Amino acid sequence: MKNMIFSANISKALCLATVGITLMMPAQVAAATPAMAVETQAVNEQGGITVFPNKEAQYRIPAIVECKSGKLIAFTDHRYHNQDIGGGRHLDIVMKTSMDKGATWSSPEQMVAKGGNGIATSFDCAHGDAAVVVDKKSGRILLMCASGGIGYWESKRGHLLMMGRYYSDDEGKTWYGEEVTKQIYDLMPEVESAFFTSGRICQSKQIKVGKYYRIYTVLCTRSGNRILYSDDFGQNWKVLGKNVAEAAPRGDEAKVEELPNGNVLLSSRAMGGRHINIYTYEDKKTATGSWGKVIASDAKNMGVAAHKNSCNGEVLMVDAKKNGKKVKLLLQSVPVGPGRNNVGIYYKALETPADYATPEAIAKNWEGCYQLSNTTSAYSTMVQGKNGSIYFLLEENAFKNPKTQTDDYYDIRFYDLSIEQITNHKYK
């Protein structure tokens, strides 16, 4: 099966050709037979908007939700010391809103979770890496995050990287939060450092035990991924699967998505692509089941290829049509590369149960990739709006002062995309 990358311009396509992707002009596509093809498409037509400009502050780590009213909320870290949580550094989680589907955004930034007390062992030293979901029925917003002033590599029992939980019941106008460090670490006695992967928390469309539909999120730990679920919208969490340590033993930041049969797809950050696994339910109500064998998805199996980079991205399943036939379409965003450059969205249809029966089936033979960015770009996330649009938020245009700053920070940019755009009109 051929993969096709729809690139923003010829110069970018030439760059992709250097990473082992065969370059072809559009007129040559039908007659040629390479593994991957590049076709031109102007990125500026997509109308990207800078929500958080890097000239105003040191921004990183995007998340986005659509509220019940249609209001959009974009979240990011405001990093005052140009680095992640640790060493007592100050980070806040901030937000902006849009009432017109992303055409315009509020200003200035609004505070969600404020840090800055300078005490590394205090919960309110810093907050970052927002993972967010809106409950489909009530409209309540849940945000899980990393907190405190102890870093991921410094963390150990008795001196832990902390965790926070925030709720809003008025579409982000007000927030109330609390520390949940003990509650989460008590689920995993073997883990000494963990944080919630930023971006989208997945809510089930099928499984409802009690008042809420089930939600899923993934912890990044130094011993691989730990997948959690909650049946009360984040008040209490449980580990998904007795063999959860086998889900992705080398996993990094990861996302989950619900498959058409209710099983859970794990897509974890990896050098060169993703690590893929599936949790197969025995009993959905009690959440019993088991994880399969993790499989790499990368250029070797015509999967999700992230050349010379390992980066957080989003996995999302949407309803689509091909020639009038309904299909489930799986999307995965990553920097196409080389390095943290050229963020794109890979796609593949799940047309039959065999297409998502095993991790291997999902990992291989992705159909194509829409390259959205033609510059430095890294973390990305997306949700599908009520109108069918794919609301996409990413880090773009890296910047740092090499004399005074150790890490890049970015513009946080928004794109309103359609399934037709992403798939070059193959699906709609």
What are these regions (language model features)?
Residues 13-26:
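Bacterial N-terminal signal peptides
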Residues 33-428:
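Asp-box/BNR beta-propeller blade signature and adjacent active/binding-site loops
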Residues 6, 20-22, 90:
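A general, composition-driven signal for non-globular sequence regions
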